């Protein structure tokens, strides 16, 4: 699976009574699907995945899988601390049409951060049995943890571990990871223009076949339905796929170093603004990319500061449904809302 470009960390909308607002989630995903972002990440670390029940997780994954455009890469975050629980979510994600899962270290046992053998066992056991490829999550802030270079290099050799999102990525750390995983080479299926081929694209191609109508079985004329043209695919060789998961405004140096793309928090409420930073670089105009990055820097920093409550209010301002965070997280104060309104005024959504 090709992982690159801008990925959006989806929020989970809640109604005022605290239930998942699935219709609003469906609308949000449909709108993100009209944007030029490459992928959507559900229930990622740092969001509210840990507040969801098992049935809510199943509902959220199902709605996203049904609402997303087929060409958008779908990645499901796993907020479970056991191998069994993680695999249950991976199975749900596969059934919903997702393309990969995002796996972070267990958060219930801080002592694991000092025990590489147990960490390796957790990640490897999930990767062994997961029906979907695994992306690793690394973040030095609680409750997650930054994965050591040695552990990343070990896990990258696993055939079902295809890359990582790194919230602390610097040019130096990226180069160290790239060097440690330089022997990893895999073929992925892409379109004629080297865009990802998702599982839902392949499923649609299998379903679009020529068939004979039921009426023709009664002796009438057969009616053949011509299949849609199949998606033309080719293969591309990729290494261990590394995505930045920090501020959008700091993306350019990482892209210049070779990072495949990014998962910026700001993309949830301003996907177009984040994409323009990436697109300008891909178009060979780093000066324009730097200019675009400066335009979003203040909004970017504020989203990092205010967290999910700030992102959700930003979504409300920019045409998505954010709503309130789920308790015990608090909504923004009036002063904080004014700050978000001020910085998002010039950021394209």
Regions found by a protein language model. Give the residues of each.
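Active-site beta->alpha loop and helix N-cap motifs at the rims of alpha/beta catalytic domains
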Residues: 1-146
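Generic alpha-helical structural context detector
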Residues: 8, 279, 312-316
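Conserved, mostly hydrophobic/aromatic
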Residues: 18, 32, 64, 93, ...
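A non-catalytic, amphipathic alpha-helix used as a structural packing/dimerization or gating element
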Residues: 24-27, 31, 59, 63, ...
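A general structural signal for well-ordered alpha-helical segments in protein cores
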Residues: 57, 61, 86, 174, ...
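C-terminal extensions of enzymes
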Residues: 309-349
């Amino acid at each position: 699976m090709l992982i690159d470009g801008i990925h959006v960390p989806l929020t989970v909308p809640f109604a005022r009574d605290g239930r998942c607002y699935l219709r609003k989630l469906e609308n949000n995903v449909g709108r993100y699907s009209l944007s030029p972002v490459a992928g959507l990440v559900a229930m990622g670390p740092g969001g509210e995945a840990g507040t969801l029940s098992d049935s809510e997780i199943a509902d959220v994954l199902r709605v996203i899988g049904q609402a997303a455009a087929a060409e958008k890469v779908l990645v499901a975050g796993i907020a479970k601390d056991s191998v069994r629980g993680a695999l249950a979510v991976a199975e749900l994600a596969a059934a919903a049409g997702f393309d990969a899962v995002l796996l972070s270290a267990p958060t219930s046992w801080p002592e694991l951060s000092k025990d590489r053998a147990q960490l390796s066992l957790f990640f490897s056991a999930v990767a062994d049995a997961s029906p979907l490829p695994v992306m690793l999550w690394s973040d030095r802030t609680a409750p997650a943890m930054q994965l050591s270079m040695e552990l990343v290099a070990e896990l990258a050799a696993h055939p079902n571990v295809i890359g990582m999102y790194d919230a602390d990525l610097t040019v130096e750390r990226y180069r160290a990871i790239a060097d440690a995983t330089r022997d990893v080479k895999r073929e992925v299926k892409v379109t004629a223009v080297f865009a990802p081929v998702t599982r839902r694209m392949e499923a649609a191609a299998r379903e679009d076949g020529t068939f004979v109508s039921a009426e023709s079985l009664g002796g009438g004329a057969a009616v053949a339905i011509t299949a849609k043209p199949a998606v033309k695919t080719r293969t591309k060789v990729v290494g261990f796929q590394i995505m930045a998961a920090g501020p959008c405004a700091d993306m350019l140096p990482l892209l210049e170093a070779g990072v495949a793309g990014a998962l910026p928090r700001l993309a949830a409420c301003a996907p177009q603004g984040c994409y323009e930073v990436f697109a300008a670089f891909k178009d060979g105009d780093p000066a324009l990319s730097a200019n675009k990055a400066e335009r979003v820097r203040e909004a970017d920093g504020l989203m990092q500061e205010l967290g999910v409550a700030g992102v959700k209010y930003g979504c409300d301002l920019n045409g998505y449904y954010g709503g309130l965070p789920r308790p015990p997280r608090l909504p923004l104060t009036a002063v904080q809302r004014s700050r978000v309104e001020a910085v998002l005024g010039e950021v394209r959504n």
